[in-house]
Amino acid sequence: MAAPLDVNVRQHINKTKGIHTDDWKIISLNSLIMKTKAKPFIKWVGGKGQLIEQLEAKLPADFDNWDDATYIEPFVGGGAMLFYMLQRYPNIKYAVINDINSDLITCYKTVRDNVEELIPALQDIQAQYYALQDMGAKREMFMAVRQRYNEKNLDPIENTAKFFFLNRTCFNGLYRVNKKGLFNVPCGKFM
């Protein structure tokens, strides 16, 4: 399982706390995107990462000259196109994202609004997982986290931490639910 957040990201977030504005998280996100190569932080089936050139070719020829552009992403998934557009076009002042998966949207909102509370939750679940020595114990932890995640009564921080964990440790980063709406992907070989 990869580290939940790059140390540089956390340091950057800590530095931007000195900005006295209600929009500091937006400012830190924009400056972070401009200073780093932001990439999707979750795996997602059907990602647009390999289609970026074809999709970008569909933009109006003068798009980079538009003032205060708004980017709308109706099927954000892992966010490859979103991150590319925000880095490539500094004239995009607003981004609106959507997806049918409410837990995915909760994940994006939690990263945007509560990253400082999310980081310790991710570190805790990662430490528990790495402390396990054998594959059987790791598989048991995966199943316990999956069961708790499926209870659907979690606060956004816990929900997102479990969502991340399952995404990183399940089979191929797949998100699939059964007829009851319960996440049912087995553990993967990332263990």
Labelled PLM ranges:
Residues T70-I72, V96:
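Structural motif
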Residues A2-V9, D22-D23:
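Acidic, Ala/Val/Gly-enriched low-complexity intrinsically disordered segments
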Residues F75-V76:
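Class I SAM-dependent methyltransferase "Motif I" SAM/SAH-binding loop
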Residues R88-M191:
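Class I S-adenosyl-L-methionine-dependent methyltransferase module
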Residues A80-P90:
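Conserved SAM-binding loop of SAM-dependent methyltransferases across substrates and taxa
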Residues H12:
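Cationic, low-complexity basic patches in intrinsically disordered or flexible, solvent-exposed regions
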Residues W24-T70, A80:
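S-adenosyl-L-methionine
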